[in-house]
């Protein structure tokens, strides 16, 4: 290339560069920047620095788009400043009103929605804030338990010296409608129903209407008229006491099988056609069937249906009215009852809780259960509904009984578990298990009693939900 061509080429490049600069017109106006489409929210809290009446900060516990948070009892949730992190350029609103982190006071007295909109306006994400007053330490234990075991709703109550000292509702009683759990929310009790049955039996006993050592079946038995005298060998030796202690002798349990037969038909089949595996009174083998028979005894002896007798006697004595027999169908759920959520492919509405009412079909609130506990705990502030001798009989551990492995067994009384080495502070207690249900209540040796009710149950084999729930209750009781 000759020198003239080089000069022409250089001149062309120089001219082209000037044209580009001229078209840019200062540069910033036409350079396109990429705006963020992120719409996340994190680090939600109520900081002491942002709220003058708070002595300590409260941090939210997040599960997906759901955030649980507790502030002390004396903090007004109607006007509290939240702190949170959102992407640069994104905006947040509550009820359509803009909210700035660490600046805007908001009302969190009810379920609150925070909507985060991305910088470019193309994405928005909603977060649900469930704020409540309470003890952040106690509630933190409950939140951790809920997240670990995927439980939508939990209710907890604690009493000390026969007075309720703490109660709280956590999460949703009904997820779809976002109905919140309260201490008045009704939950299925599952096997905690057995204590309702036990108390009804104790009431009949104290009224002189029932002998604990009376035979149940066969000639002269309490239920002779209902089930005749043609019973299997030794069935006529089964007593009320044996049924209360799970030592009736049956190895099979027909209560939670899928069948259209009535309770009377199932009882008749068991006593007339199913041989006992163990001698009555000799061997502990947990039996829902036995407690359903006790429910039948209550109705026959009292002349009233099971729920009516409980309400007119045991519950009336305790001044409570919010305990009922539950319903099988979701559509028949009471207005203040939670919905139950199965896990692991389990159907939370697959069990016949109406048939099994005396063994596992009752519903109640934590608030009512703590009131009831005050009448059966040997306390001095609230008069017990039974004589000390009756309570002693009900709470005395098994004697001269073995388990199905042939080892001495003393961990059950009459309708109550007792003497568990892992829970030395608990005098008596009982839990409950059904699909969609996990429950526990405990009477402690120092009269700090407690109850936990859940509307779901995890079947994850990598963790023990019951052990976690029991330890959580024990830890909460230890704070009082």
Write out the residue ranges for each language-model feature.
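Bacterial N-terminal signal peptides that target proteins for export
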Residues: 2-12
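Beta-rich interaction/scaffold domains
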Residues: 25-136
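Short active-site loop at a secondary-structure junction
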Residues: 149-155, 168, 177-242, 278-287, ...
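Alpha-helical scaffold elements that line and support the substrate/ligand-binding pocket
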Residues: 158, 162-163, 188-211, 243, ...
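Active-site helix/loop module of the DD-peptidase/beta-lactamase fold
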Residues: 188-191, 204-250, 300-340
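Catalytic loop of the DD-peptidase/beta-lactamase superfamily, centered on the K-T-G motif
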Residues: 25-30, 134-168, 311, 316, ...
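C-terminal motif of bacterial Sec signal peptides marking the signal peptidase cleavage site
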Residues: 20-22
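Catalytic-site signature segments of enzymes, centered on catalytic residues
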Residues: 231, 252-331, 356-370
């Amino acid at each position: 290339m000759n020198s003239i061509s080089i000069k022409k080429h250089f001149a062309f490049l120089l001219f082209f560069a000037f044209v580009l600069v001229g078209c840019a017109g200062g540069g910033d106006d036409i350079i396109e920047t990429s705006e963020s489409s992120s719409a996340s929210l994190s680090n939600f809290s109520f900081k002491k620095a942002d709220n003058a009446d708070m002595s300590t900060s409260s941090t939210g516990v997040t599960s997906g788009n759901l955030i649980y948070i507790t502030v002390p009892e004396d903090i007004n949730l109607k006007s509290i400043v939240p702190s949170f992190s959102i992407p640069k350029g994104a905006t947040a609103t509550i009820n359509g009103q803009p909210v700035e982190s660490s600046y805007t006071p908001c009302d969190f007295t009810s379920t609150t929605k925070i909507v985060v909109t991305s910088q470019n306006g193309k994405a928005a994400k909603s977060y649900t804030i469930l704020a409540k007053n309470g003890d952040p330490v106690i509630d933190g234990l409950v939140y951790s338990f809920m997240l670990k075991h995927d439980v939508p709703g939990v209710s907890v109550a604690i009493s000390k010296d026969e007075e309720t000292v703490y109660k709280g509702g956590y999460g949703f009683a009904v997820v779809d409608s976002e109905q919140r759990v309260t201490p008045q929310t009704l939950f299925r009790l599952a096997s905690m129903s057995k204590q309702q049955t036990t108390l009804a039996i104790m009431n009949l006993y104290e009224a002189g209407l029932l002998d604990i050592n009376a035979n149940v079946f066969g000639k002269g038995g309490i239920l002779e008229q209902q089930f005749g005298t043609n019973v299997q060998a030794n069935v006529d030796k089964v007593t009320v006491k044996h049924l209360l202690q799970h030592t009736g002798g049956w190895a099979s349990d027909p209560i939670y099988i899928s069948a259209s037969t009535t309770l009377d038909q199932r009882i008749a089949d068991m006593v007339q056609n199913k041989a006992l595996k163990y001698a009555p009174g000799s061997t502990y083998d947990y039996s829902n069937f036995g407690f359903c028979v006790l429910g039948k005894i209550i109705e026959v002896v009292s002349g009233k249906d099971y729920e009516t007798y409980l309400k007119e006697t045991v519950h009336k004595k305790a001044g409570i009215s919010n305990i009922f027999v539950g319903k099988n169908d979701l559509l028949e759920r009471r207005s203040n009852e939670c919905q139950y959520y199965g896990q692991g492919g389990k159907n939370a509405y697959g069990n016949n809780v109406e048939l099994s009412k005396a063994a596992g079909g009752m519903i109640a609130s934590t608030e009512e259960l703590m009131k009831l506990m005050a009448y059966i705990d040997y306390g001095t502030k609230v008069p017990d509904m039974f004589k000390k001798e009756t309570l002693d009989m009900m709470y005395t551990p098994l004697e001269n009984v073995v388990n199905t492995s042939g080892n001495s067994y003393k961990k059950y009384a009459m309708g109550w578990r007792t003497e568990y080495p892992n829970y030395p502070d608990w005098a008596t207690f009982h839990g409950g298990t059904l699909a969609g249900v996990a429950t526990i209540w405990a009477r402690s040796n120092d009269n700090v009693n407690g109850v936990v009710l859940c509307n779901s149950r995890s079947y994850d084999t990598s963790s023990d939900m019951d052990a976690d729930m029991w330890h959580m209750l024990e830890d909460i009781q230890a704070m009082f």
